[in-house]
Structures are given as C-alpha cells and as structure tokens.
Curated annotation (Swiss-Prot):
Species per Swiss-Prot/TrEMBL record: Methanosarcina acetivorans (strain ATCC 35395 / DSM 2834 / JCM 12185 / C2A)
Keyword terms: ATP-binding, FAD, Flavoprotein, FMN, Nucleotide-binding, Nucleotidyltransferase, Transferase
General function of this protein: Catalyzes the transfer of the AMP portion of ATP to flavin mononucleotide (FMN) to produce flavin adenine dinucleotide (FAD) coenzyme.
Assigned protein family: Belongs to the archaeal FAD synthase family.
Name this protein carries in UniProt: FAD synthase
Cofactor list: a divalent metal cation
Enzyme Commission (EC) number: 2.7.7.2
One annotated GO biological process: FAD biosynthetic process
Residues where ATP binds: T21, F22, H26, P27, G28, H29, D104
Amino acid sequence: MLAGCYPRPGDLLTRVLATGTFDILHPGHVYFLTQARALGDELFVIIARDSNVTHKPKPIVPEEQRLEMVNALGTVDKALLGSEKDMFEPLKEIRPDIIVLGYDQHFDIELLEEELTKRGLPAKVVRVPLSKECPLCSTGAIIKAVLKRYG
C-alpha cells in the first residue's frame, strides 16, 4: 500500500505526516515521531534535504543516511526526502490528514493550514510540545557534549 503514489481513494486510515532534519538521531526525535504516530494509523516522514536546511547549521549526517535511519524506526511507515524546490510537492502525493510539527519548527499553524487549503490539501496541523527531557535530547546538545569531550 505504500508503494508508488501512496493511494488514498476509499481508505479509512488516518494518515499523519511529520517533517524534520533528523540530524544525529536522538531520543527527542523518537519522542516526536512516537507522538505523531499516536495521532493516526500511518506515519509518513519527510526528511529535509541538505540543500534546504538554511535556518540552522547544515546537517552533519548526509540526507540519504538520515533517511535510512528514520525509515528503520518501527513507528514510521514511510520516510522520504523532501523536494528541493517546493515543500508542498511531496504532500500532494502523500495527502496527509494531519501534519505534526515539533516544538522547534517555526511555522505559523494558521498560515500553513491556509497554504495547504489553497493547494487542495485540507490537512489539520498540530504541534507536539516539548515533553521529553534528557541531557542529550537535541542535536545541538550532542554536538556540544562531543566537542567538550574530544574538542
């Protein structure tokens, strides 16, 4: 069912979509994806392309490797690389019912829902609050710890 163009006609499953860079996979990512999965029956994940990451330092882990890691998680039905040109392009194929944002993804939910509706993609957008706390629950914290130890 997850091959090709991700069929939707007549299906009663709730399809959830999460997006992110997922550089240096950590428990915060796992928490986010587990919370996203709990909102529906299928979880698709779009991995940010290396070339599109402009709001923070470029990923350390190459996009193909990040894709492989996320696809290996049991909570994820299908992970795929995003479009380098149009962030809405893969959504046209996936046609999610719910789009889940992380606490650190700086999208305005109302504006995003408006843009989705304009494109014939009336998905509900929700944000997962930060709830997983651990010393190394962010890529930045992991990098700082490595530099401190081996710097």
